């Protein structure tokens, strides 16, 4: 009986020892597998490696390196640069939401940064190019035909840039993009007005065209909005309003192609100087 008890106890000890050894082996393997290869790297080396990865298009590899650098070089200009580079990598990698989040954090944490103008510019650019880019040459879809939320947020970021940093090297490009955005917002209203007009909903077309004219100033889309008013009043036989609008059209747009050629093709956007 005693021998049996000792034998049972010995087996239990052996099993426990084997389990412990196995656990240590597994833990050791896991530690080796998950070892941080950058543990002994200098911040400058991490930065160089991250730039190389981003330069080759491996944004998924560059982003975690920039994140490590933010921690390793915290409180230094290099950490700020890493944060901006990470935002750019997120943007180029197709994660616009994360890029905006990173930039918002940068703007909040570093209000005195010499790179703050770039942060605003990049934030505007991310929203400007959201989903389809400046132009979609494949689908021929321009900004006025897309969701306007991103366009408005892009405009706000560019506006912050040019108002706070009018002499920034990024401001001239931002102003051009702002002009395009404003026209695209007006053109979006005109697109709806044109849709209503094509369906014979002339009152609705008038309302949307008037909204574009009331809300926006000095943008190319207003020429088409005015022409839509003219044609809608004509269709409704509202002679006085039609004639008044024709006089406005002739005075404001004396060489308008609309009066001779009708509605312009949406395949030929006005914006040519990009």
Predicted regions and their residues:
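Acidic, polar-rich low-complexity tracts and alpha-helical solenoid repeat scaffolds
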Residues: 2-6, 25-274
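Bacterial N-terminal signal peptides
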Residues: 15-25
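Bacterial N-terminal signal peptides that target proteins for export
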Residues: 2-17
């Amino acid at each position: 009986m005693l021998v049996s008890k000792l034998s049972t106890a010995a087996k239990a000890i052996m099993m426990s020892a084997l389990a412990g050894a196995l656990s240590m082996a597994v833990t050791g393997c896991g530690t080796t597998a998950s070892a941080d290869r950058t543990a002994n790297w200098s911040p400058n080396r991490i930065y160089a490696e991250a730039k190389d990865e981003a330069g080759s298009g491996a944004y998924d590899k560059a982003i975690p390196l920039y994140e490590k650098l933010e921690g390793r070089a915290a409180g230094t200009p290099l950490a700020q640069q890493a944060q901006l580079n990470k935002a750019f990598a997120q943007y180029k990698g197709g994660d616009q939401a994360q890029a905006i989040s990173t930039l918002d954090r940068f703007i909040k944490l570093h209000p005195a940064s010499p790179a703050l103008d770039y942060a605003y510019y990049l934030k505007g650019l991310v929203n400007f190019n959201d989903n389809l880019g400046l132009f979609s040459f494949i689908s021929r879809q321009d900004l006025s035909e897309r969701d306007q939320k991103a366009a408005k947020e892009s405009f706000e970021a560019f506006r912050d840039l040019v108002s706070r940093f009018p002499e920034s090297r990024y401001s001239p490009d931002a102003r051009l993009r702002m002009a395009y955005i404003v026209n695209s917002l007006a053109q979006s209203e005109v697109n709806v007005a044109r849709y209503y007009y094509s369906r014979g909903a002339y009152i609705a077309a008038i309302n949307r065209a008037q909204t574009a004219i009331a809300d926006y100033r000095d943008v190319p889309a207003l020429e088409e909005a005015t022409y839509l008013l003219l044609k809608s009043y004509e269709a409704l036989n509202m002679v006085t309003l039609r004639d008044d609008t024709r006089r406005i059209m002739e005075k404001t747009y004396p060489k308008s192609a609309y009066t001779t050629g009708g509605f312009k093709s949406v395949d030929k956007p006005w914006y040519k100087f990009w």
